[in-house]
């Protein structure tokens, strides 16, 4: 029986008993106040006894009533508040990440303050500052720009609030307690390896034309995506089997601000006009994620006349899965955000209980202040051969969603 129920039970019982003494209270109220003088010694003793009984009963009733509120208040105070900030609602994967996180945390008994920052750094700074000021017990942060949140992170550290960096590593801050993400270097490797196999680069002489696209330069994950892919592809570029006709191979040249599809499309339009407008075939496009791949695919549909290239991606966003089924995108690396959310909830739970959360990488992710203990989830390659098994049979999508 909870403290609340016990309090109500006691109060009801006392009220019932009190009813039997109402007349006594009324009759002897003056005696309790000391305003009436009994006529005999026996009467005095009787009145004194009843006065004590009434006084004790009233005190007990008051105490019982007082117990109820603090018990309920204590229960509310025990429910920890977790602040979750996501970069934007404009990309499908962040909507799914945020909702999965909120659902998992609430199921585990936490209150959740979920915020989306519309890809605006100043908005995310304000959201984090508010979460710190409003007494969040822990912060889960998927940053827009991993190097731009120093001040609210400093405030969190000063208040002893743990911070979990979610998917994108928060840089140059010693306030970061843990990092949870997918093996992002492996994501890039899988994209590069897919292109090697699809073009049969180990057996064909080539040359094959390829263009390169990655994401926002402020997102530390880009270094892993692009680095993993280029560690696979660079030797084929060096020996001439792969040719980047645009000449754009450096990270700064191939980055896409905010992972924006429109920016990727604009750049691809320019590349097509300058290098492939005469019918020259483009054989492959390395795209670090689905939003950049979508921009490339839109540009190809608008102005490219050669044979359709092999295009990589990541996240399995619904427009890209539809394009995959239609033959307009060869693959996408699937990062099941349900698995990541579950891993983070376990981390949160351990931290809130004063325990060490599970990590599986203590070497790879240095944010500029030291290596951050990290939990890595595994990515999976999705193609037309396995998309039903990976995406539909698992319940991630319904068939209707990707028709």
Model regions: which residues?
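Intrinsically disordered, low-complexity segments enriched in serine/proline and basic residues
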Residues: 2, 7, 11, 25-26, ...
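Short hydrophobic alpha-helical segments enriched in small aliphatic residues
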Residues: 5, 15-17, 22, 36
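A residue-level marker of the well-folded mature domains of exported/periplasmic proteins
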Residues: 23-34, 38, 42-46, 50-53, ...
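C-terminal segment of classical bacterial N-terminal signal peptides
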Residues: 64-73
